[in-house]
């Protein structure tokens, strides 16, 4: 019998269950309801084989923007057309239902649907992370897209679901303090067919799906992030680098070759923004640690397209190395197009998503080329954060409602 979780737009729970267990079905809900700043989202992204088009969909249960008076059920759809134009739209829905139809052997599906009058967006994700399908039916957009996995599901420390099951172990779902996630479909082949305001968007490419949940709002748990997903020849690559509020970087990486994991790990390291205590603790930990893994994102400049805010990088070098295996994998990203962009109160903070190229492989071996989707975010701090939320409040008071997350170009 299916387990069902139902959430309405303005429903607030008195108490919630917050699961961090890797034994839970990959895409099933981890938060029983919304209380305070807890949030949960199902995130899908993609890029066409030619690197010109892309689709990003976020289905969230999130109180971060309740100041707008629109509830906690947000759906963001960001579309990049072949000619470089965009459709960025946010819907605030009335109800979200997630059904766990999985079995103990990871068969079955996790089904979700966000609805409002005349609107529905639904997903169906295989319990084992092998495939997913999304259907969109709104006045602006109608159609569907599918994903077929190229790599097995992965947890932040690099464990795959198959490894955990075969070894009878559990994994941590925590990427950084308060934020948890699982790469349900790290990389996949992608097929999309959407009609967006009368414009047909149909392409094949690569994509993936991440399920994330947290005990605090984005603005209070991380200073920002850099994430990428790409496929180059036989290699599938993901990297997620988040900086916590203490200035400590948590960088999770994954490299798969022809469906077989070659690297998976989490590196945590201090930065100049970190406290002296944190720097010392991490230094002593690393000195004692054997088999150290390195997961690094190094920005590059003057190679491609940059966003409008403070981070002017136009690409990155991703490097994954393991002291145990002695192997190093290196991939170069180049940003070629903007998928979407939001500014957060100043020119120094914002979020830019990119479509672009990736090339690389194992050091000393053949170099492969492909496509990648990535995004770079710097969240506002201090007075800038306060100013950002004051602007949202003024927009609501003055105009009744402004969809600040929506930009169409």
Swiss-Prot record:
Its main location: membrane. Belongs to the Diels-Alderase family. Pathway: Mycotoxin biosynthesis. Diels-Alderase; part of the gene cluster that mediates the biosynthesis of UCS1025A, a member of the pyrrolizidinone family that acts as a strong telomerase inhibitor and displays potent antibacterial and antitumor properties. These compounds share a hemiaminal-containing pyrrolizidinone core fused with a gamma-lactone, giving a furopyrrolizidine that is connected to a decalin fragment. The polyketide synthase module (PKS) of the PKS-NRPS ucsA is responsible for the synthesis of the polyketide backbone via the condensation of an acetyl-CoA starter unit with 6 malonyl-CoA units. It comes from Acremonium sp. This is Diels-Alderase ucsH. SUPFAM superfamilies: AttH-like. It is a single-pass membrane protein. Pfam families: DA_C, DA_N. InterPro entries: DA_C. Disruption phenotype: Abolishes the production of UCS1025A. Keywords: Isomerase, Membrane, Transmembrane, Transmembrane helix. One of its GO terms (molecular function) is isomerase activity. It comes from the Eukaryota. The chain crosses the membrane at residues 386-406. Its EC number is 5.5.1.-. It is an enzyme of class 5 (isomerase).
